[in-house]
């Protein structure tokens, strides 16, 4: 059996059994015949009717009679499979069958997805993100695109179709007049969705620099949860009791626990210093609980190049490069953070569990949704002269028809 294929299966934590040198069984999915594409000039061929077919050296009917319905092959750097019972289609060999059991099995929801609607930064369709979420046994999925709500309606539709809960999130930058602070907003109710739309307007319509003023942000907190970014701890320490203004405005407040590793040491130091400040001065107060949100821009570790390429297209250079901003399972999250804490000073397991529980808390409270059962038109705002002439929009409409 090809060692590269076995490494691929191990890296993707898939359960499998080797039947013989050409056949492998993915537990919970089925048997696959290994096609060595290095032995052929092209993976495609045409049949007698000029239809394009997969160029397999094996007789498909014979494979099916032996209970082998899939052909697995390498194309480029990835491994794909083909269901011989259907028309040929590339299917990447991921998120199928049974996954190797995790050591950490508590409930957790990924709230850090950045979709392709965050242009030239996030990647992969929402269908792919949802597929991996379900493969990992997660019951909900949250997005947090920066300065855009473009993916929210599609998220709702895709999650409804897949039978999981959705969480509308939004990443932004606000200012107190001196400092600029990053945060995430997560909708909890219909009121929260309306307020998030108002926040979106403040940023993308009213603001010249796409940053919202703190006073405007606090006006639209009802029905929403705010999560302060991993870099915000120094500012949070400085404002002290003024944090109460956020609790008065928002339904709840959290601190983003994200210890993803970057390629540049200076960025890692910045993250670690900010996280240390949070645990030294804020964590023990219990006022601002941690929530485990890793900003995810690509599905798997081997997809990290996506963000680099997209950033170079957008700005000519890729800043804050990382191979660690992918959709992790809980064991991978644990491995990222456990080695960074002094086990004699901190109860790491307790911190980890609390941060995971808070992702579930946010997801369970997320009831905001778009009404898609009816069609709506934009509301017309009457000008002052129209208001003086007509009692309401309907009267104006009828008069204009005449």
PLM-predicted stretches and their roles:
Residues 57-62:
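Short nucleic-acid-contacting surface segments enriched for D/E, G, S/T with interspersed K/R
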Residues 79-93, 153-167:
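Short acidic, glycine/proline-enriched helix-loop-strand junctions
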